[in-house]
Design a protein with these regions (language model features):
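Conserved ABC ATPase "signature" region
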Residues: 63-64, 111-129
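Helix-to-loop junction immediately C-terminal to a conserved catalytic motif
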Residues: 48
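A short, proline-enriched helix->beta-strand linker immediately N-terminal to the Walker B motif
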Residues: 153-157
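Catalytic Walker B motif of ABC-type/P-loop ATPase nucleotide-binding domains
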Residues: 159-162
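Conserved ABC ATPase signature
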Residues: 134-138, 142
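Helix N-cap at the start of a conserved alpha-helix in ABC-type nucleotide-binding domains
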Residues: 170-172
Length: 252
């Protein structure tokens, strides 16, 4: 279980997250929605330990990770996988080397054991036989799948996805959504997905949370979220722009 308790992230007078509270159950897929700059990606960085909150607690499996040293957190981080928005593959490494990276750093497995796991994970994401390819030989969707294969190499109990369908065509985006759902079912892991893709959100989520101005204004099951009476939820679902004053040259 993951719990965020009164989490604040602020830079001088700018508040990114404002006393955020949230509980994520084991095995749940939670989708986090919100406008640009609402703090979605900041939340992921906090959970995976790439950033520390200004105040508050982040409890992962009963441990407040905000109190851990970097060495202590590395042990926790081995149970986590992350799929970054732009895949974040190592350009100088082959596909197989990218997927094997965490296994070589964090385990004492033999080369044969690592080779077996790499082949298996690539098979899970539909890229069997791609070990020798270089990242620059892959499409955007294939890079995302390699990133996912790398994220699941260590059998994580938690996978974080930062805009997994960003920059992808609708068909490829649908493939990524199916893989997200498939990994949750295969591994029984907890998944946190940050996305702007409503179709993907509704497909993969058990619950959906909407961040607005540093606070969660809605956290509910997918069907309840769709039918929420909150006008900001409906505005986000239907992509309705807020009215703004536009000054033209003629108006000046």
């Amino acid at each position: 279980m993951i719990e965020l308790r009164d989490v604040v992230v602020a830079y001088d007078t700018r508040v990114i997250l404002d006393s955020v509270n949230l509980t994520i159950a084991d095995g749940e897929t939670l989708v986090i929605l919100g406008g640009s700059g609402s703090g979605k990606s900041t939340l992921l960085r906090l959970i995976i330990g790439l950033q520390r909150p200004t105040s508050g607690q982040i409890i992962v499996d009963g441990v407040d990770i905000t109190t851990l040293s970097e060495e202590e957190f590395n042990k926790v981080r081995q149970k986590m996988g992350m799929v970054f928005q732009y895949s974040a593959l190592f350009d100088s490494m082959s596909v197989g080397e990218n997927v094997a990276f965490g296994l070589r750093v964090h385990t004492n497995m033999s080369d044969d054991e690592i080779k077996h796991i790499v082949a298996e994970r690539l098979g899970w994401v539909g890229l069997s036989g791609y070990e020798s390819y270089m990242p620059n030989e892959l499409s955007g969707g294939m890079k995302k799948r390699v990133s996912l294969a790398r994220a699941i190499a260590l059998d994580p109990t938690l996978i974080l996805y930062d805009e997994p369908s960003s920059g992808l065509d609708p068909i490829t985006s649908g493939t990524i959504s199916m893989l997200i759902r498939g990994m949750q079912e295969r591994l029984g892991c907890t998944s946190i997905v940050v996305t702007h893709d409503m179709q993907s959100a509704f497909y993969v989520a058990d619950r959906i949370a909407l961040l607005d101005k540093g606070k969660f204004i809605e956290v509910s099951k997918t069907e309840d979220f769709k039918n929420s009476p909150n006008p900001k939820v409906q505005q986000f679902i239907h992509g309705e722009a807020e009215a703004i004053d536009i000054v033209t040259r003629r108006d000046r």
